[in-house]
Amino acid sequence: MVNKVSQFVRLLRSTGRERRLGTVIFFVTSRCNAKCETCFYHEELNRPGDMTFEQIERVSRTMPQVTDLWLSGGEPTLRQDLDDIIRLFVENNGVRRVIIPTNGLLRSRTRAMVENALSLDGGLDLYLNVALDGYGMTHDRVRGVPGNWGRTLECIRALYPLKERYGDRFRLNVNTVVCAENYAEVGRLADFMWENFRLDGHYFNVVRGETKAGDEIKQIPPEVLPEMYARVSALTERYGGRMFAADDAATRFVKSVAYVGAITTHYRTQHSNFAGPSEWPFPCTAGETTAVIDYNGDVRACELREKFASLPDFDYDFGKLWEAEGREAELRRIDEGRACWCTHVCFIHDSMRHSRRAQLWEVPKNYLTRARW
């Protein structure tokens, strides 16, 4: 037990606590080949004005070192120079983790992108989060694309050889947005994917923002959530067992506490904020440790907030924009989350990992209480 505690403490110490920029969420294009009812970004889709590669290059050159780069959209694989964009941030900014959400409709392009990225640098990890928002026809209906379900499953299978080649450097995940259309079949979808696909993780996030379908798609009965969260928390533990199977018992235990405890903390924070604002158990660090860059160069502290500055106004010099008064004013408006609230897992996670209280108390506590909802 002493050995397990020592390993857990070392794991906590390896997680950075300094409140400086470490995660960038970059909407590389507004183009999308789906029509998702749950999309919070629908008003910005398929518009002109994507930044050019030259403009992105200047942004990267003037940005500090960051560890995590999310490449979103739109559908990020529609951007033809996506491989070059990844290379830019790896070479200029020392990115260690690239996280890409995708609808899985472009199988060949997705596979080539993953392979090209992982061949760049032996120290780079890539997390591909494939969207599945229901079982079978439900997924097609929510996504607005007939045949999407089958094409996405084919895309997942096509990535198995890369998973075998790159091992833990390539995390192949599924992400499900829970909404009024699919909450009743979360269990069926979760079991099907666990039993039939070689995934590293399957994550469930309640619908957020001003969606294309309006408020109707957000009408999940609150009474179904405890059972759902209990089920997906147990699923998270099973995936953790799969991911860490090769480790010795002590290491496997430590990683399980950290992983399952963190994901359960995400879910508990989302659950407590489902119907209305509830204070997070740690300060929100949006705009300090995270930045959101839109396809046209607008910059936001959080995906759910308005822009506080625009890169074209700073000649695409990210450093100048980041140090300007506009960001400081936005941080005062956010007030570490006291002045706004959300269920956005990206910001829950990044805020959590910069909080000693979260790491030393919330994560272990939520691991121990993972079955109680």
Regions found by a protein language model. Name each.
Residues 56, 152, 318-321:
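Hydrophobic/aromatic residues in well-formed alpha-helices
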Residues 2-125, 210, 220-224, 355, ...:
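Conserved alpha-helical substructure of the radical SAM core
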Residues 19, 42, 278-283, 292, ...:
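Flexible mid-to-C-terminal extensions adjoining Fe-S/redox cofactors in radical SAM and related proteins
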Residues 75, 102-104, 132-134, 176-178, ...:
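Short, flexible loop/turn elements at secondary-structure junctions
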Residues 1-21, 242-273, 351-373:
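Alpha-helical membrane-targeting segments
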